[in-house]
Amino acid sequence: MSPPFHLQRKSPSTPVPAAPARGKRICVLLLSGGLDSATCLALVTRWGWNVHALSFDYGQRHRVELAAARRLAKKYRVASHRLIAIPSLGAFGGSALTDPSIRVPKKALGKTRIPVTYVPARNTLFLAYALSFAETRGATEIVIGANALDYSGYPDCRPAFLRAFEKVARLGTKAGVEGTAFRIHAPLLKTSKAGIVRLARALGLDTSATISCYDPGPAGQACRECDSCLLREKGFSEADGGKVILPLRRRT
């Protein structure tokens, strides 16, 4: 079975992956407002795909990212942008991103196999919503900014998980059993953060319009100490001598 993500190998002369070999497509894209999902949005827009974006308010402490998602959706003129509320996910707790009693780890990048910022079954839920929306819109492509290099401990960012969900889409939907082939695209799955930064630049993405911090201040200013901030800064520092892009000023 072909993999659910369709990565085109990049070279210095061709930094932007070519579109998979089919005609113009309709896709549902998971848009958080962070660097990875924004880069995916810029990429599929470059490909000429018709984009329906989904964002989620699940009680995350970094809810300010949703404002960035709205701005990105407007800038890239997506066909539609839906904000889905999943209050129960936040109510369940169990993650530093949704449970105020669990502190977001600082300066702890790579110290645990599965960090406490993992939100139980989050991508499973997000992809299920995306699949439902895709079926109503006649879309066959679902795009997610999952990355298995920077967050190798997240079980719902692994290739095996995405392959399995593609099978779920085929077996568990009317469109699937009638022969529609849904495909999960994770174009950044095996790309380093520096590689993502380079791709974002090649696509002309305004990276300062994205928010990556897990524990931001009320105005979106980053803590610069959580895993996500450290990965972002590392990516910019490694990308052709690039420097950190705001909003990454330290909170006061």
Enumerate the language-model features and the residues they cover.
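AMP-forming adenylation/ATP pyrophosphatase catalytic core
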Residues: 24, 140, 231, 248-252
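Immediate flanking context of iron-sulfur cluster ligation sites
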Residues: 203-224
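ATP-dependent adenylation/nucleotidyltransferase module used to activate substrates
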Residues: 3-204
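Iron-sulfur (Fe-S) cluster-binding segments and ferredoxin-like electron-carrier domains
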Residues: 219-222, 227-249
